[in-house]
Amino acid sequence: TITQNTYLMRNLKELRIAVAGTGYVGLSIATLLSQRHKVTAVDVIADKVDRINRRESPIQDEYIERFLREKPLDLTATLDGEAAYRDADFVVIAAPTNYDPKKNFFDTSHVEEVIDLVLKVNPDAVMVIKSTVPVGYTASVRERFSYRERLADGTMKVVVPNIIFAPEFLRESKALYDNLYPSRIIVGYDRGDSALEEAAGTFAALIKEGSLKEDVPVLFMGSTEAEAVKLFANTYLALRVSYFNELDTYAEMKGLDTRSIIDGVCLDPRIGSHYNNPSFGYGGAALELGDVVDHL
């Protein structure tokens, strides 16, 4: 439960934000939010922390590199997650969740390590999972990390952690650009929790505040539906890449002009001319097609 001493009683401009992870997802959201808010980025790799504090990007992203170099960002990086989370209103979790072929599941252990530490040092903080996770994960992890607390009158109360889910729709090397010009903002939360509803609205406002695009569509839904949106979007993009690669393979085998076929197919407005250039196959930590389908 969110107490009266947290961000709900503060002006939007006074928020303190911690970001766990400084990969494409974490560093892009940290850069975006630090335009207007105090942001502390947490990582376990000292070299990445040092480079961020020197205003050098540890990842290849033109916009992140330029913003770190030229913008007056209120951004610091640290190895000390406990200190970063202790005073945070929001903790954005962008820890890696790569697919584990041995377990046949996403490895969410790093996400849970962050949740566990936040609950120890700042249980009132709102945690926002941006890592790719299985459908139903946010609801299950909230239940798993629930705990009993004794009230002043001696009665026991079940406390459910403040965790919401906000999927990312980013391209590597263009992560900050995609945050500055988002196609949509989606935030999922427990629809029966009015405090989390307000937290979801505040987080969406933070993202919208940092973006440069006007009239960004904002969708609120259950956390499980938001998780499904992320995985189904990934699945469609993977299918589309595979489709045009197969078209190209067929055309090459038959001695046909691939571009003519693609142009003719894609002029249908139901198909469109985006993501239609045959090349290498799809890839990325969150774009493992067979693995994604297994968890839908």
Question: Model-derived features: where do they sit?
Answer:
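Structural/interface elements that position substrates and couple domains in central-metabolism enzymes
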Residues: T3-L296
